[in-house]
């Protein structure tokens, strides 16, 4: 049974969610019985191996359905091996991407049927959804420009996609925002990092209170 708190972070490329996640850690240590951070795809050995296959820049021939099914397989392994045990122990789990990425990227971005993706998500997660999703919204061109300037970020296959795909991905996220505004909360990611972190922390504290 789920006793902990699951918070996912979502956004288009270059939104800075990974940096925000790291900056939030000192403020969230006292929620639940502990705190873990993890990512999709990845988080455990099998899922990290799948991640390498998905993001390898040379895998340009990958079919959209193949890509989706690899993400779903990674998701299931990650959940059963790491996320669900942590939640059962009452921990706060911060996830860099989760189910909404599949809807935005493979649904809106690749043009696959969103209902099919939602069914696969349901199948892989047994219906688990985040208690809160922070969606970091940024203009697509600004986000991609950030990536181009970053010396530490390795280029992956999705970075090589055209602007049109990334625009569709953002529209997918905004569609989720319209559909699930209670769970899916927008943060303006074009602001300085410290302001984005402060806004994110305020949303978390409003939803779950201050840690005891």
From Swiss-Prot:
Any one GO biological process: dUDP biosynthetic process
E.C. numbers: 2.7.4.9
Claim: Kinase is one of the keywords in the record: yes
InterPro entries: P-loop_NTPase, Thymidylate_kin-like_dom, Thymidylate_kin_CS, Thymidylate_kinase
Catalysed reactions, as listed in the record: dTMP + ATP = dTDP + ADP
Sequence positions that bind ATP: 11-18
Keyword ATP-binding found: yes
Keyword set, alphabetical order: ATP-binding, Kinase, Nucleotide biosynthesis, Nucleotide-binding, Transferase
GO molecular function ontology, one term from the record: ATP binding
GO cellular component: cytosol
Similarity comment: Belongs to the thymidylate kinase family.
Job description of the protein: Phosphorylation of dTMP to form dTDP in both de novo and salvage pathways of dTTP synthesis.
Designated name of the protein: Thymidylate kinase
Source species: Streptococcus sanguinis (strain SK36)
């Amino acid at each position: 049974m789920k006793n902990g708190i699951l918070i996912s972070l979502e956004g288009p490329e270059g939104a800075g969610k990974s940096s925000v996640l790291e900056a939030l850690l000192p403020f969230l240590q006292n929620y639940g019985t502990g705190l873990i951070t993890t990512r999709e795809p990845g988080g455990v050995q099998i899922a990290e191996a799948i991640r390498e296959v998905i993001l390898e820049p040379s895998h340009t021939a990958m079919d959209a359905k193949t890509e989706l099914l690899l993400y779903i397989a990674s998701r299931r392994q990650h959940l059963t091996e790491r996320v669900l045990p942590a939640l059962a122990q009452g921990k706060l789990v911060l996830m860099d991407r989760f189910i909404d990425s599949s809807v935005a990227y493979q649904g809106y971005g690749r043009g696959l049927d969103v209902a099919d993706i939602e069914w696969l998500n349901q199948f892989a997660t047994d219906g688990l959804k985040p208690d809160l999703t922070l969606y970091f919204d940024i203009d697509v061109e600004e986000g991609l420009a950030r990536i181009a300037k970053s010396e530490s970020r390795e280029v992956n296959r999705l970075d090589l996609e055209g602007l049109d795909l990334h625009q569709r991905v953002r529209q997918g996220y905004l569609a989720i925002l319209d559909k699930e505004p209670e769970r899916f909360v927008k943060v303006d990611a074009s602001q300085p990092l410290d302001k984005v972190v402060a806004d994110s922390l305020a949303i978390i504290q409003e939803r779950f209170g201050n840690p005891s």
